[in-house]
Amino acid sequence: MPKKCRHLLQTSDLSLDEIKLLLEKASVYANDFNAVSLETKEKMHNKIIVALFFENSTRTVSSFEIASLRLGAKIVKLNMQTSSASKGETLTDTFKNIHAMQPDAIITRHAFSSAPFKLAEFSQCPLINAGSGVSAHPTQALLDLLTLYQHFGSLENLKGKKIAFIGDVKNSRVANSNIKLLQRLGLEIMLCAPSSMLPSVSLKTTHNVEEAIAFADILMSLRTQTERHNTPIFASLKDYGNAYCITQQRLKAHAKNKEVIILHPGPVHRDIDIESAVLEDERSKVLEQVKNGVAMRMAVLEFLLLD
């Protein structure tokens, strides 16, 4: 029988008290990446973490690598394009072979939503889901929450705030994880997209970006995930941007909360998802999200490997 260990496959794996602890620890690291205690560094020194990414990544894989190194751990990144997976080895066999080398944690990303849950059934080390299909990306939701926590000052202040997700919500694991987490914390949610990009959920929806902007205290723009579309929804990304881009003009004309903040999980399609001028605006928290990704992943790794 595999021994019991903690995994992070979805945000519901964490209690609210554990989420608060992660926010507190990550806030310390966000203020100073070098604020890792000597005791933590000593305990992490001999830890070996494997990053097993079957899909492309820039921010997430780099963020986990930097987080691991800042804690004092070692990380091994596997290039799946040159691995035995490209020769026909199954996901399960690849994982079991890596698992047999006894790493202290495995971080995985896969196109199938069920992949991390299947692997967790026999994993004897902590498994972190760094993105699975369109269903879950828990550390992204946590770092987004950290960004909101910093801006609004507390979880209590977040209750009742209104957030609009604009873009390809249906195919976004980021949106899915964020929605589930933010509902637990009492935020009001609206989804804004063309019908083909909206999931079947009992939430407020609109096809009108101006309505979403007027509704929100927080705007979360999402990339159009054309790689997950069977047929084109718009003739071009420019046509999509004409309808859904967050622009200064739209913010000025329609935002009831003039201090509305703008988030995006990346990669951003400039002038398609968000206008370049808005990305440079102080209301944009996109680069803060990237920084907070390192801090939150430091907190998550420490929580799973040491606590």
Swiss-Prot record:
Catalytic activity: carbamoyl phosphate + L-aspartate = N-carbamoyl-L-aspartate + phosphate + H(+)
SS bonds (residue pairs): none
Top-rank EC class of the record's enzyme: transferase
This protein's record includes keyword Transferase: yes
UniProt keywords, alphabetically: Pyrimidine biosynthesis, Transferase
Binding positions (carbamoyl phosphate): R59, T60, R109, H137, Q140, G266, P267
Pathway assigned in UniProt: Pyrimidine metabolism; UMP biosynthesis via de novo pathway; (S)-dihydroorotate from bicarbonate: step 2/3
InterPro entries: Asp/Orn_carbamoyltranf_P-bd, Asp/Orn_carbamoylTrfase, Asp/Orn_carbamoylTrfase_sf, Asp_carbamoyltransf, Asp_carbamoyltransf_Asp/Orn-bd
Binding site residues for L-aspartate: K87, R173, R223
GO terms assigned for molecular function: amino acid binding; aspartate carbamoyltransferase activity
One GO biological process term: 'de novo' pyrimidine nucleobase biosynthetic process
EC number: 2.1.3.2
Family: Belongs to the aspartate/ornithine carbamoyltransferase superfamily. ATCase family.
The protein's role, per its UniProt record: Catalyzes the condensation of carbamoyl phosphate and aspartate to form carbamoyl aspartate and inorganic phosphate, the committed step in the de novo pyrimidine nucleotide biosynthesis pathway.
Subunit comment: Heterododecamer (2C3:3R2) of six catalytic PyrB chains organized as two trimers (C3), and six regulatory PyrI chains organized as three dimers (R2).
Protein name: Aspartate carbamoyltransferase catalytic subunit
Organism: Helicobacter pylori (strain ATCC 700392 / 26695) (Campylobacter pylori)
Gene (name only): pyrB
